[in-house]
Amino acid sequence: MKFYGREKQRKDLHRLFLYEGMQIGLIYGRRRVGKSELIKQSLRETDVTSIYFECKQTTEQNNTESLSVLLADTFHFPKPSFDSMEALLTYLFEAAKEKPMILVLDEYPYLREVVQGMDSVLQALVDRYRDTSALKLILCGSYVDVMKSLLLRENPLYGRVDRTIDLKPMDYYESAMFYPTFSDEDKVRLYSVFGGIPYYNRLINSQLSVRENIIELIASPDARLENEVSMYLKSEISKINNANEVFEALARGFSKYSDLLSHSHVSSSPALADVLEKLIRMEVVKKEAPINDVNNKRKAGYIITDNLSLFYYRYVFRYSSQMNVMDSDVFYDRYIRDDFEKQYVPRQFEEICRQYLIRQNRAGKLPIPFDRIGKYYYDDPQTRTNGEFDIVTEDPNGYVFYEAKFRSEPLTQSMIQQEIEQVRRTGMNCYRYAFISRSGFDAQADEGVELIPLEKLYE
């Protein structure tokens, strides 16, 4: 199975593996984001002796036995006997005095549950062998809150972790590596549904159309990913009904706290705040404010950041009764097709364009690097309306306005001029304009205006 992307994280792990002395690494991120595959791929690319152990939700004795078997297989000697996990780990720290070694404890929170004082055990071993052992210990886990707690001052391991990798979903560009044969337009559509989770993207069948992949994987009864979102939520949140209500309201386009409270049917404001806080910690929802008014709570809003969750709650969860009694193609045509093309994908395209600009900014390819990117809140005195520009960057010279259009016709000169005039009416200190178009342009770029075709995003 081919491995895609994650170049920076692989380089970080290789530096850790090649360090002369002891190193402690922490890798965490949401389920399915590719932590284990990243580690396994990095281990395949190093000559350092390694043991990869997936901790189990059993007992200390069972985990100790299983790790002992791995130890024997790695070093080709009879299975040793250890009466505790501490004794086994002590043996490995000792062994790494003679020869560097990598030990990966994947799903570390499971081990932490069954071994009393596990963090303290590791702390004592790290302190004892810090100057003499060359063990590279990697702790990995999907329970983000638990893994982050290892870095807190009150935790025994505080100050002992040498490298931390908070693994995020891939962006649109790395995700497209999983489906290279699709057109650029279809890459946008696929990312809009399956996002940057490697597990989802590996399931995409290049022999099928985008529509067929969606039906096959998420929009039909018993589809491979039909229960993926709800199962993930249930594993993290006890009051799943409240989470479902909030997600459905967000998927319908409500983003302000007051709107969510009135449209989600969550019983109270504290209950809503609790659900939103948990969803934000799970990194499937985020709170964002306009870059020109970041401290104004009234203008802040919440959005779903996990694309599969957004698609699921907008179409599958909302119309599940219809989906279960209809032909899948008829269901898609009636409840998904038009809204998907006219509303859903164009909104997701804006996020793809933001990611493109961040990639360009990090690579030093923009004329002036920006400090912030986000929405811009405006008042239009001529029409006496207010609203938000979806993609604006801020740098020392002022603001740059971007307009993303995922439409089947080229952008014309008059459309571009209309957008520029609207920006100027707001009084925004905008010194440059750029337009990103799925279908190209029937226009010429004037001074201070950049025209970016879709194919440039995938170069």
Please provide the spans of the model-predicted regions:
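Phosphate-binding site recognition
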Residues: M1-R334
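A cross-kingdom feature that marks ATP-driven nucleic-acid transaction machinery
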Residues: A300-E459
